[in-house]
Structure formats: C-alpha cells, structure tokens
C-alpha cells in the first residue's frame, strides 16, 4: 500500500523544485534522503520534510508492518504550479515592472519495494 504527502503553497518556483524532484524520483528512501542532505538547493529542505512525512504516513497506514528506509522507494514525485502573486516594481521613467512571485504544490508518493520472484 502506498502513502502520500502533499506540501502546498511553497514559496518557490516550480521550475526550481522540479530539479530536486527529478533527482529523487524512483530512488530508495534512504538514498533520496542522502541526496537531499547533500544538495545545496534551498528547496531541498521542503522536499526532505515532505519525504519524511510520506514515510511517516506509510508507517501510520501499515501499523502492523515494520519497514525501514531501504525497503521503501519514492514511487512518484511531482510538482504542480500554485498561485502566482503579481507585484509591481518601480522602473525608470515612471514605468513599472511586473514581478511574479510563484509558488508550487509538491506531492511525494512512497511504496514498498516490489520483490522480484524468479
């Protein structure tokens, strides 16, 4: 059974968050945590918190099952665009530039590693 965690209205550009989502997609949870800990990107903290939340949700959904981080895999990670705040920045000669403050919604889905039977 898979578990999911969603972080909404994160004040980061979706483009920047998708860079990190691509790094951890399909990886075991322990390996994904190591990647995020060593990342210099500012959004790595938000991805790490959401990943930990998804693992905790998996443990809560399966209370009789003891699983470690090596047994769980990041099945899906996707980033959707959130609300965009539009602001004005004063510009030369009485004009104004539009500043778009973007946000995103991060979804992380974890599942147990499927054992291949040969």
UniProtKB/Swiss-Prot annotation:
SUPFAM superfamilies with a match to the protein in the record: Ribosomal protein L22
GO biological process: translation
Keyword NAD among record annotations: no
Superkingdom of the organism of origin: Bacteria
Alphabetical list of InterPro entries matching this protein: Ribosomal_uL22, Ribosomal_uL22_bac/chlpt-type, Ribosomal_uL22_bac/org-type, Ribosomal_uL22_sf
Entry GO MF terms: rRNA binding; structural constituent of ribosome
Record keywords, A-Z: Ribonucleoprotein, Ribosomal protein, RNA-binding, rRNA-binding
Keyword Cytoplasm annotated: no
Cellular component terms (Gene Ontology): cytosolic large ribosomal subunit
Record's function text: This protein binds specifically to 23S rRNA; its binding is stimulated by other ribosomal proteins, e.g. L4, L17, and L20. It is important during the early stages of 50S assembly. It makes multiple contacts with different domains of the 23S rRNA in the assembled 50S subunit and ribosome.
Subunit structure: Part of the 50S ribosomal subunit.
Family stated for the protein in its record: Belongs to the universal ribosomal protein uL22 family.
This protein's name: Large ribosomal subunit protein uL22
Lineage start: Bacteria, Pseudomonadati, Chlorobiota, Chlorobiia, Chlorobiales
């Amino acid at each position: 059974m898979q578990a999911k965690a969603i972080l909404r209205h994160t004040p980061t550009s979706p483009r920047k968050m998708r860079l990190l989502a691509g790094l951890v997609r399909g990886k075991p949870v322990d390996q994904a945590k190591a990647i995020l800990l060593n990342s210099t990107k500012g959004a790595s903290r938000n991805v790490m918190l959401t990943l930990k939340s998804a693992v905790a949700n998996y443990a809560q959904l399966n209370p009789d099952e003891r699983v470690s981080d090596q047994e769980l895999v990041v099945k899906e990670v996707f980033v959707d665009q959130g609300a965009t705040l539009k602001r004005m920045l004063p510009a030369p000669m009485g004009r104004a530039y539009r500043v778009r403050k973007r946000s995103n919604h991060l979804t992380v889905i974890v599942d147990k590693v499927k054992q291949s039977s040969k």
